[in-house]
Curated annotation (Swiss-Prot):
Note: A lyase-type mechanism (elimination/hydration) is suggested for the cleavage of the lactyl ether bond of MurNAc 6-phosphate, with the formation of an alpha,beta-unsaturated aldehyde intermediate with (E)-stereochemistry, followed by the syn addition of water to give product.
Active site: 86 (proton donor), 117
HAMAP family documented for this protein: MurQ (MF_00068)
Name of the gene encoding the protein in the UniProt record: murQ1
Function in brief: Specifically catalyzes the cleavage of the D-lactyl ether substituent of MurNAc 6-phosphate, producing GlcNAc 6-phosphate and D-lactate.
Residue ranges of every copy of the SIS domain listed in the record: 58-221
Family: Belongs to the GCKR-like family. MurNAc-6-P etherase subfamily.
InterPro entries: Etherase_MurQ (IPR005488), Glucokinase_regulatory_CS (IPR005486), MURQ/GCKR (IPR040190), SIS_dom (IPR001347), SIS_dom_sf (IPR046348)
A Pfam family: GKRP_SIS_N
A GO MF term: ether hydrolase activity
Pathway info: Amino-sugar metabolism; N-acetylmuramate degradation
Protein name (database record): N-acetylmuramic acid 6-phosphate etherase 1
Subunit structure comment from the entry: Homodimer.
Length: 304
């Protein structure tokens, strides 16, 4: 695409409030950045209905055994990989359920890979490599809205029958036109013109957090506001798990710890055990009947 088109993008324009930032005192530089960052949450608020649709698509995919697949280049790709990586320890889901793909592969997480984002075919190839199916939801991330790699990925996703969602910071973008559904969060010019690792990336991180978290809540991975499907993989998370069990059941620390051990470190199972006075096997059956929903499991028990 032509450079003249790139220059017309909102994310590439100069920010009038930061034009003299090179002459500012350090504290004043930080105030300028902080003031600009305050506008990001407001921009995200404007697109919440669009984010809601993305959550619905994502939940639909997960319920069918499909996946949420983030794909992007550079900062956008890294954000997708980051969000995907946080889901297994937080919600005890398979690493295959939420996937992050970055143009150029793993080495691009640390260093720029020349030309990795410049070809639509590369986006298609990387989705083919993960055996994309029509049960999946693909979220293509590109602040500019014009990255060929992401454009190719979304075109292929749509052709395959997967849900194709674009996430960008410019309106009426190429990737939005290629998608089934678009989220265009317009944060305005960056403090450093074109440096979309700043406000644009912050907005995208917020939205990716929302999509994955809301999807997991709807999949029964959260009870009240507690991380009841946390994967107990270290001492800190074990302490958190025990505290969650205590909070929900009102039992003392020692009882909660024993239940966690008897449930093979499954927080939900431990909670059901203590709430119903049943053993781990019976608690697991209740959770199976309720598709992992604690409230429904307890309701089934009370009616039995």
């Amino acid at each position: 695409m032509e450079n003249s088109h790139l220059g017309s993008l909102t994310t590439e324009r100069r920010n009038e409030r930061s034009k003299r930032i090179h002459q500012a005192e350090t504290i004043d530089m930080l105030k300028i950045m902080n003031d600009e960052d305050k506008t990001v949450a407001e921009a995200v608020q404007e697109v919440l209905p669009d984010v809601k649709t993305a959550v619905d698509y994502a939940v639909g995919s997960l319920k069918k055994g499909g996946r949420i697949i983030y794909i992007g280049a550079g900062t956008s790709g890294r954000l997708g990989v980051l969000d995907a990586a946080e889901c297994p320890p937080t919600f005890s889901i398979s690493p295959e359920s939420v996937i992050g793909i970055i143009a150029g592969g793993e080495k691009a997480l640390y260093n720029a890979v020349e030309g990795a984002e410049d070809h639509e075919a590369f986006g298609r190839r990387d989705l083919e490599a993960v055996n994309l199916s029509n049960n999946d939801t693909v979220i293509g991330i590109a602040a500019s809205g014009r990255t060929p790699y992401v454009l190719g990925a979304l075109k292929y996703a749509k052709k395959t029958g997967a849900k194709a969602i674009s996430l960008t910071c410019n309106e009426n973008s190429a990737i939005s036109q290629a998608a089934d559904h678009s989220i265009e969060v317009v944060v305005g010019p960056e403090v450093i013109a074109g440096s979309t690792r700043m406000k644009a990336a912050t907005a995208h991180k917020m939205i990716l957090n929302m999509i994955s978290t809301a999807a997991m809540i709807k999949m029964g991975k959260v009870y009240e506001n507690l991380m009841v499907d946390v994967k107990v993989s270290n001492d800190k998370l074990k302490e958190r798990a025990i505290r969650i069990i205590q909070t929900v059941t009102g039992m003392p620390n020692e009882t909660a710890a024993q239940a966690l051990e008897m449930s093979n470190n499954q927080v939900k199972t431990a909670i059901i055990m203590l709430k119903t006075n049943e053993d781990a096997a019976a608690a697991e059956k209740l959770l199976e009947k309720s598709e992992g929903d604690i409230e429904k499991a307890l309701s089934i028990y009370e009616k039995s």
